């Protein structure tokens, strides 16, 4: 839990001792420990690494979770509160510590620690670490956002999603680290909730499908133990939102894909949200039961504002479902035709409160670039339906094509609020895609924005239809056989989005190459395809 103590608390002398640390990160460093009972803690406390996130001009969230037995429900920790010292320094050797304090790792939050390290200078990099039980954590590198309203030369942001553990290794993250991004934006499917499944697997999930807190903790630990994923957290601050698999496939509010008992599903959602909170460097309030607000903005000086949304927690039921399906607790229909309620203007993807919040943010944002960090593909897309060979269009019920009125509200808001240079970044579809966004009231007019879906870190999508249908769906680019991520580089005049594709996501040492690039021009909405 957050408890950044500005002044360093006095150290009880009877428990003080000085230790010499091993390990490259802290070689030769001396530090003292004031933790009562620290000697009783098991070793290997920092098995899950460290992370930073949600930078502000004067602060950044620092995260770790003490878990000497990371796959155990309690992480192998005693059921007691544990003091954890944190330090922020200007140098990697911690000779110039500028902020420090003691936070408490509480058993009811899985001994996770979220420190709001404040009093920092804007727009610069810092090093941080945690100390507990005579051990030092790995050293992470964080970054503060530029000063509010400051002119900023540039922003480099890598955006990614969908990292199914079983489908590949995390070579993509090694390449992200090499890009030295200011910020990493993760757009959902950080974990997958499925049971271990050997089909197409290069490695297996280590616990059965989670439904309770212990199960979700073990699943996050499985992912977080990966050294390449840890290295990406250690290299730069992240901003995250979730999609469905952080809880369960294709859920909508309180409805699971199987339309099971909503009360049972909300108990599961509460466990999943708590585990998500416990494992991510989020600047949000901890969850209360099955509720956790994660939509928020993040400013990068005068240059950019990210509006990070949650399209799962508050969405209405999927459209065009057969009557009585929910009541009968039968699985939802994921491919739908057109029906009366598809375009019902009252149907919502974000929920009314989040929609109002977004409307206000889009109207008041002072930023030159406005980046909507959302989960999936916004462009209206036709999908094949093997069950219906007729020419009638079919849509995915689970992405924005299943909530067209909600999507058009955002597009119209960009126009009416004169939002400066809007862009949408997304994930979810396990494919790279890029498209112009047009005003729904002037479909033949010039683009009002562009959207970029940045592939998947590992998760697969093998169907040939995605590329076949791409021209008809108006995609300027479509690639679903290559894994990877997107990189956004912007400055005051313009910038680019580059898609980075792995040679083979099933290899830890895979190389990477640019597979597409699009240029952006401030004041001229839309994307411009470049040749690689
Ligand atoms: Fe996914
Ligand atoms: Ca998804």
Please describe what each predicted stretch is.
Residues 2-33, 38-532:
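Metal-dependent phosphoester/phosphodiester hydrolase catalytic core
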């Amino acid at each position: 839990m957050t408890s950044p103590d500005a002044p360093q608390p006095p150290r009880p002398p009877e428990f003080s001792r000085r230790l010499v640390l091993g390990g490259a990160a802290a070689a030769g460093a001396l530090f003292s420990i004031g933790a009562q009972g620290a000697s009783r803690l098991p070793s290997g406390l920092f098995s899950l690494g460290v992370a930073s996130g949600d930078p502000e001009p004067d602060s950044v969230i620092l995260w770790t979770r003490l878990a000497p037995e990371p796959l155990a429900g309690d992480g192998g920790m005693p059921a007691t509160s544990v003091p954890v010292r944190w330090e922020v320094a200007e140098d990697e050797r911690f000779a110039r510590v500028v902020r420090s304090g003691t936070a408490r790792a509480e058993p009811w939050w899985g001994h996770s620690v979220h420190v709001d390290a404040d009093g920092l200078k804007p727009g610069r990099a810092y090093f941080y670490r945690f100390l507990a039980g005579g051990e030092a954590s790995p050293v992470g590198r964080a970054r503060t956002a530029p000063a509010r309203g400051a002119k900023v030369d540039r922003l480099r942001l890598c955006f990614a999603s969908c990292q199914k553990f079983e489908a590949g290794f995390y070579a993509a993250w090694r390449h992200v680290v090499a890009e030295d991004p200011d910020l990493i934006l993760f757009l959902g499917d950080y974990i997958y909730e499925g049971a271990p499944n050997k089909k197409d697997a290069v490695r297996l999930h280590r616990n059965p499908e989670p439904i309770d807190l212990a199960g979700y903790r073990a699943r996050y630990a499985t992912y977080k133990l990966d050294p390449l994923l840890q290295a990406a957290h250690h290299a730069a601050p992240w901003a995250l939102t979730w999609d469905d698999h952080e809880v369960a496939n294709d859920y909508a509010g309180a409805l699971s894909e199987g339309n099971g008992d909503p009360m049972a599903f909300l108990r599961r959602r509460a466990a999943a949200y708590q585990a998500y909170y416990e494992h991510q460097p989020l600047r949000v309030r901890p969850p209360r039961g099955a509720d956790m607000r994660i939509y928020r903005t993040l400013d990068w000086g005068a240059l950019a504002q990210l509006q990070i949304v949650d399209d799962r927690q508050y969405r209405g039921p999927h459209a065009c479902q057969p009557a009585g399906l929910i009541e009968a607790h039968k699985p939802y229909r994921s491919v739908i035709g057109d029906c009366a309620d598809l375009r019902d203007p009252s149907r919502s993807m974000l929920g009314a409160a989040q929609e109002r919040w977004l409307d206000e943010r889009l109207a008041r944002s002072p930023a030159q670039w406005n980046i909507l960090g959302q989960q999936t593909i916004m462009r209206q897309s036709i999908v094949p339906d093997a069950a219906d060979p007729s020419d009638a269009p079919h849509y995915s019920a689970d992405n924005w094509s299943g909530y067209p009125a909600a999507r058009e509200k955002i597009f119209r808001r960009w126009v009416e609020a004169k939002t400066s240079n809007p862009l949408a970044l997304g994930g979810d579809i396990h494919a790279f895609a890029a498209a112009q966004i047009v005003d729904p009231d002037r479909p033949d007019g010039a683009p009002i924005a562009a959207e970029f879906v940045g592939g998947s870190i590992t998760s697969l999508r093998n169907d040939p239809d995605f590329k076949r249908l791409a021209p008809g769906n108006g995609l300027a680019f479509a690639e679903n056989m290559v894994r990877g991520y997107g990189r956004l580089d912007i400055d005051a005049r313009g910038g680019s989005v580059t898609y980075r594709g792995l040679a083979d996501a099933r290899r830890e040492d895979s190389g990477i190459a640019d597979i597409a690039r699009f240029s952006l021009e401030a004041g001229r909405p839309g994307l411009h395809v470049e040749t690689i």
